[in-house]
Amino acid sequence: VRGRDDACPGALRLHPADDGSLARMRVPGGLLTGRQAVALGRVAEELGDGRLDITSRGNLQVRGLDAGCGAELAARLRAAGLLPSDRHDRVRNIVASPLSGLDGGGHADVVAWVRELDAALCDGTPAGGGELSGLSGRFLFALDDGRGDVAALGADVTLIATPDGGAVLRVGGPLPGPDVPSPPTAGTRPDAAGRRGSRTAGSAAGSGLRVRSEDAPRAAALAAVEFLAKARESGTRAWRIRELPARHAVTTEGLVARLADAGVEAVPVEREPAPRARATPPVPGPVPGPNGRHALSIALPLGRVSAAQWRLLAGLASRSGADELRMTPWRGVVLPGFAPDDTRGALAELSDAGLVTTPDSAWLGVGACTGRPGCAKSLADVRADTARMVADPARGVAGTAPGTSGTARGAADPAGVVADPAGVVADPEAVVAGGSMPWPVSGTAYGGGPAGPDPLPVYVSGCERRCGHPGGRWVDALATGDTDYRVTVRGARGDTPEADSTDSVDVTAEQLADAVAAARGTT
């Protein structure tokens, strides 16, 4: 039983940190117009420390804010269309397939789903999502276009587009892959579906529900309403689906009934063996599209950009013709709408500015927590130490993305690291599971192609909380003092820092590159 509400920062709830207050702006699906991007850049420059951080949910953070700037910040966000509902500010947590509709992959363009779900979340009427203002700031929706990229990010409610133009609604945990089983025939009645659901394990997370594409966003919102009802029943003040006790789980039968009451037909999908989806980021570089236009995929060193870098991204978004910037849950950016002849010049501008535009960058696979001076608990300035580690040309510590040559491009200006609020141990946008930082998944090339053994992801932490560390197997570089680190390979067969660790090596910051390079090659 939780004794308090979650403390996730928002645009209206600033979080105090050692380097000033922190604001987190929810950006559903990571979708921004060029005008909105410019407005956010001005917020960072004029109110914050001049930098922006992309979180593991494709949201934005600004640090270094004055504690009294909340009213001005909110007014600027409202004017830019980035704060449609004060009551629902922190619940608009939606990740979406960032290349949806751009590269010919997937089964549907889920951008429309993003817009409709966001509207449903902010609908304050009883017939809409009025209850949803009670969701925790940690509750997450994922909208997958069928390629399986965001379906594995452990969202509370996930929609997966299917080849026949429909959708599967899944509730809870890490999800099976995009090859979802075929639903029952369209003639199956909801009452029969409910009876079949009652014979399952009783959790909608176990099988999923087939819904029409046009009903999918509303079905996702109603699944969240069902969660809130179960959370109240349980008296546990649960923040996430997985925290509900078994006797108060969101069941297939209960969810089918709630959807039916709202006029949404939902048919349970039979559980069948399916490979787990792998959450893989778009490959940095040009992304050809079937309409003759190209998108640009850019990774950000440690998830942070300077105001100048952000202005460049916003300017290119406006010049492209699409006037759109998409932030990814891997702390990258996708810019749609470029003519093929314009991509080379745009990528050169981005690379010259210190951003990652090729899949062979030494920054790929490297993450770090906030560290000093932003976090009082950190023992070291891990951002600076990580930048020196990556830039060490003699060691090539970061290795390369699998299947690439090893050239370290885009490492000129790390611009800092992703901002995780100091003191928030279980922040969902800091604690990263299942590879949702910009690193390859074991056994695949960057972007999902087959490859040989991959270099392990590296995470540099300022204290033993290890805020933001990846799941799976990873290299843990833990600060033990101002200039000292302990390097360990962790998580060989588990997701906790204590699982199956190798022997540790204690080194100075100057020796970190060698130690991490050796550990990263461990298989």
Model-flagged regions — what are they?
Residues 175-180, 200-235, 243, 247-249:
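Internal alpha/beta scaffold segment
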Residues 20-170, 175, 179, 201, ...:
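Small-residue-enriched alpha-helical segments and adjacent helix-cap loops
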Residues 481-523:
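Glycine-rich, small/acidic residue-mixed loop/short-helix segments
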Residues 1-39, 260-263, 267-315, 319, ...:
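Gly/Thr-rich phosphate-binding loop signature of adenosyl cofactor/nucleotide-binding cores
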Residues 1-12, 180-200, 400-450, 518-523:
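Actinobacteria-biased recognition of intrinsically disordered, low-complexity terminal regions
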Residues 176, 205-209, 371-374, 492-505:
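Short beta-alpha connecting loops at secondary-structure transitions
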Residues 183-185, 257, 261-291, 413, ...:
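Long, low-complexity intrinsically disordered regions
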Residues 51-54, 128-135, 229-279, 322-329, ...:
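Flexible, glycine/charged-enriched surface loops at secondary-structure junctions
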